[in-house]
Amino acid sequence: YLSGERTPHNSADIRAAFHQINTSTSKAAIIYSVLEGVAFGIKDGFKAVEAINKNTDETYIVGGGSKSDFWTNLVGSAINKSIIIGEDSNLGPSLGAARLAMMATKNFAGKDVFKKMPIRKEINIDKKLSEILNKRYAVWSEIVSTNLTIAGKLKIIKN
């Protein structure tokens, strides 16, 4: 969380942190840890959605990240779901906004607006990676919880 978070923590003050860095920590390890942290943040949001909507049989990735099989595999393995890359995944964010605008006009039926995106490919989870990520996520969740408390204390000191 580099600039605060709304879902599911609702804390504008939480920030990213690095743990267990030493003089032998490589640049690649730091870069990977950022990607893994973002994937865990996505998992937090995904879990919040699943808590109120169990209908998550298909999971699509959209935006620029959909161009990277590495990123798609990392996210899918983190959330324990195969990820679908649609033909229009790179347009996903703007297409979603356009669809919401169409629905707001009340001139379109949901069935006409929310059509299934043609599938370009599906990235299955890496079971070994998923097991490792689940263990790391448990620790990461503890760190986030602690960081939420620390962020609140730092805010008081700043003010």
Feature map (PLM): residue ranges:
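Glycine/Thr-rich phosphate-binding loops that ligate phosphate moieties of nucleotide
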Residues: 1-159
